[in-house]
Amino acid sequence: MSWRSEDIWIELLTGSRKLSNFCWALILFLGSLGFLLVGTSSYLGRNWISFVPSQQFIFFPQGIVMSFYGIAGLFISSYLWCTISWNIGSGYDRFDRKEGIVCIFRWGFPGKNRRIFLRFLIKDIQSVRIEVKEGLYARHVLYMDIRGQGAIPLTRTDENLTPREIEQKAAELAYFLRVPIEVF
């Protein structure tokens, strides 16, 4: 989602609160909870899951392995739920021609550097760069080359944009910032 006027362009980024992340976190949580319940019920000899008799799984080695996978899955699931609740990766890109400033803001993990805020002068921007990687896992990423700072990615690597969409976005941004486009 973006908002544009004559002098200001603001690009909002979603971050980790995507439907696919919610689905994966829920599937992983339910699956690992099932594994842990099967492992625990085989240890206790009780039937906690009605459609899986506890007598089918002896505790050593199946029950231990199922419990281990359940606990590991719960840790990974809790990590996913934390990244969703903290909304890691969300933020905005703000290009202001009137003041001559570019601001890039992202939310990170909790701690000292939770707020990632970068500020550059528009005159320090050398170019807008498109990096294309072809093959089985084709990828198109948009970068902004800053003098003395290197390249800063503006699109996420998992943002499956078509070549036409990435070219359109790069052309609009380069026109707005009045800088050239490079393709690598």
Swiss-Prot record:
<comment type="similarity">
    <text>Belongs to the Ycf4 family.</text>
</comment>
<dbReference type="GO" id="GO:0015979">
    <property type="term" value="P:photosynthesis"/>
</dbReference>
<comment type="function">
    <text>Seems to be required for the assembly of the photosystem I complex.</text>
</comment>
<keyword id="KW-0472">Membrane</keyword>
<keyword id="KW-0812">Transmembrane</keyword>
<keyword id="KW-0934">Plastid</keyword>
<keyword id="KW-1133">Transmembrane helix</keyword>
<dbReference type="InterPro" id="IPR003359">
    <property type="entry name" value="PSI_Ycf4_assembly"/>
</dbReference>
<keyword id="KW-0150">Chloroplast</keyword>
<keyword id="KW-0793">Thylakoid</keyword>
<keyword id="KW-0602">Photosynthesis</keyword>
<protein>
    <recommendedName>
        <fullName>Photosystem I assembly protein Ycf4</fullName>
    </recommendedName>
</protein>
<dbReference type="Pfam" id="PF02392">
    <property type="entry name" value="Ycf4"/>
</dbReference>
<dbReference type="GO" id="GO:0009535">
    <property type="term" value="C:chloroplast thylakoid membrane"/>
</dbReference>
<feature type="transmembrane region" description="Helical">
    <location>
        <begin position="19"/>
        <end position="39"/>
    </location>
</feature>
<dbReference type="GO" id="GO:0009522">
    <property type="term" value="C:photosystem I"/>
</dbReference>
<feature type="transmembrane region" description="Helical">
    <location>
        <begin position="57"/>
        <end position="77"/>
    </location>
</feature>
